[in-house]
A protein has these predicted regions:
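Aromatic-enriched hydrophobic runs in primary sequence
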Residues: 1, 33-34, 90, 112, ...
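Short, hydrophobic secondary-structure boundary micro-motifs
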Residues: 26-29, 113-116, 160-164
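A general structural signal marking secondary-structure boundaries and capping sites
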Residues: 22, 107-110, 156
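GST-like fold's C-terminal all-alpha helical module
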Residues: 43-151
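Small-side-chain structural scaffolding
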Residues: 11, 122, 161-162
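Alpha-helical oligomerization segments
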Residues: 139, 147-166
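Non-transmembrane alpha-helical segments in soluble domains
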Residues: 12-15, 19, 35-38, 97-100, ...
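GST-like domain detector, emphasizing the conserved glutathione-binding G-site
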Residues: 1-72
C-alpha cells in the first residue's frame, strides 16, 4: 500500500514505485531479443519451476493449505499435474539448456548486468527467472549466465537454490 492508500498489483509497478521514491531512474530499456527470451521462458520455465516451488521448504509454503492452494491453481493453469511435469523434466530441461545457450550470447563475458553496464529492467525481468531455474537439479548455466546470476545474487543478497535443487 502506498502513502495515499492506493495499492499496486503488479510487481513491475512496485519496482518502478521504489525507484521513484529513491529519486533514481530505472533504465527501462529492454532489448527485443531479451524480451523475446523472457516470453519463450514462460513456455517451459513454469513447467520446470512450479512443481519444485512447493518442495523447497520455502516460507510461503510452510502451511499445507498454501501448498494445496498453489498446487491446485497452477496445475489447472498448466493443464498438467505437478507429478506429470516432474516426469517430463528431461524434455523441459533440454529446452532450458537451449534457452540458456541463447541468453549466454546476449550477456557480455564477466558482466554483472544483463546489458553489461548497469542495473536495468532487463535484470528485473531476467534474474528472477534464472534464480528460480536454479531450483532445477541438472540445469547447467553457461559461463556468461553463470557469472551474471552469481554476481546479481551477491549484489542483491538473494540466495540461489542450487544447494537444494530438485
Amino acid at each position: 500500500q502506498k502513502e495515499d492508500g492506493s495499492h499496486m498489483g503488479e510487481s513491475l509497478d512496485i519496482v518502478r514505485y521504489f525507484y521513484r521514491q529513491d529519486s533514481s531512474a530505472l533504465d527501462e530499456a529492454v532489448r527485443p531479443e531479451i524480451q523475446a527470451w523472457v516470453e519463450v521462458f514462460a513456455d517451459w520455465g513454469n513447467r520446470l519451476i512450479m512443481p519444485r516451488d512447493v518442495q523447497l521448504d520455502l516460507p510461503e509454503f510452510a502451511a499445507e493449505s498454501s501448498v494445496a492452494y498453489f498446487k491446485g491453481k497452477k496445475e489447472a493453469w498448466l493443464e498438467a499435474s505437478f507429478e506429470q511435469l516432474l516426469q517430463e523434466t528431461p524434455r523441459y530441461l533440454a529446452q532450458a539448456q537451449e534457452a540458456l545457450r541463447v541468453l549466454d550470447g546476449l550477456i557480455a563475458p564477466n558482466a554483472d548486468y544483463v546489458n553489461g553496464k548497469h542495473l536495468s529492467m532487463e535484470d528485473i525481468l531476467v534474474f528472477p527467472l534464472l534464480r528460480n531455474l536454479s531450483m532445477v537439479k541438472g540445469v547447467a548455466y553457461p559461463d556468461n549466465v553463470a557469472h551474471y546470476v552469481r554476481a546479481m545474487s551477491q549484489a542483491a543478497k538473494i540466495p540461489l537454490f542450487f544447494d537444494r535443487a530438485v
